[in-house]
Regions:
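N-terminal accessory/cap region of cofactor-dependent oxidoreductases and related radical enzymes
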Residues: 84-156
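Glycine-rich, compositionally biased intrinsically disordered regions
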Residues: 2-116, 222-230
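Mixed-charge (acidic/basic) macromolecular-recognition segments
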Residues: 124-230
Length: 230
């Protein structure tokens, strides 16, 4: 994704919301490009906890998610953002990935979903109101400001569009006719670190144990005079 063009702030211009929107796109696109350019594959989860309580009913959710999307968008979703995030998986599917997705940035489509709108699926952000204090003088009354968080969604990999960036969270081994989901427990989502991923952590611990065992064995052999050691 290209870096957005910079706004020219010149004397006498009539400032409109588009100026600030483009200025924000310029800054955000630069940050995303910086994240991506640090390393070719610098994306994945630094933390991921699935909500599997509804698997027998064909529903999967997320309790915790933090990381970087492939386009460089950084995320740390709050409990409020995740509490209504779930996917009803169709019956009779198998070997299909479930993905956490957000809409890619756009300069031509609506990016903000407001509560009075019908659907939020195509919007990158979801708006909400919050009263903020003036931090130069906190004795003044706060002012209500409209803010927006990233608008995450769960989708099957086959249903992803070119207008979304996504990370797979799980692999469905099968879903039965009555919708019960069976996940592939050996599947490892893309990760930025190993210590919060149980499978990777276990593999590393096992390798470490084998190396220590081999190291001790070699050390004993070297120090044993009966085997030609010192």
């Amino acid at each position: 994704m290209a870096i957005e063009a910079k706004v020219v702030w010149s004397e006498g211009i009539f400032i409109t919301p588009q100026h600030f929107q483009q200025f924000e796109r310029y800054l955000e696109s630069g940050l995303r490009q910086l994240a991506v350019s640090q390393e070719g594959h610098f994306w994945g989860f630094s933390s991921l906890v699935l909500n599997s309580d509804g698997l027998k009913r064909g529903v999967i959710g997320i309790n915790e998610a933090e990381g970087v999307f492939p386009d460089g968008s950084v995320f740390l979703f709050s409990q409020k953002q995740l509490e209504n995030l779930s996917l009803k998986v169709p019956a009779n599917i198998k070997d299909t990935k479930i993905c956490l997705a957000v809409t890619l940035p756009s300069s031509v489509n609506n990016e903000i979903y407001f509560p009075d709108q019908d659907s939020s699926d195509s919007c990158r952000y979801k708006a909400f109101n919050k009263t903020l204090a003036d931090t130069t003088n906190t004795e003044l009354d706060g002012r209500q400001v409209t803010l927006a968080d990233l608008n995450p969604m769960l989708v099957l990999e086959n249903d992803l569009t070119s207008g979304q960036t996504a990370l797979p969270i799980a692999l469905i081994r099968s879903s039965s006719a009555d919708f019960e989901i069976i996940l592939d427990e050996s599947y490892i989502p893309p990760c930025l670190g190993s210590q919060k991923q149980p499978h990777l952590k276990a593999y590393i611990s096992e390798i470490y144990g084998l190396l220590m065992q081999k190291s001790n064995s070699l050390a004993n052999a070297v120090n044993d005079p009966n085997t030609g050691g010192c």
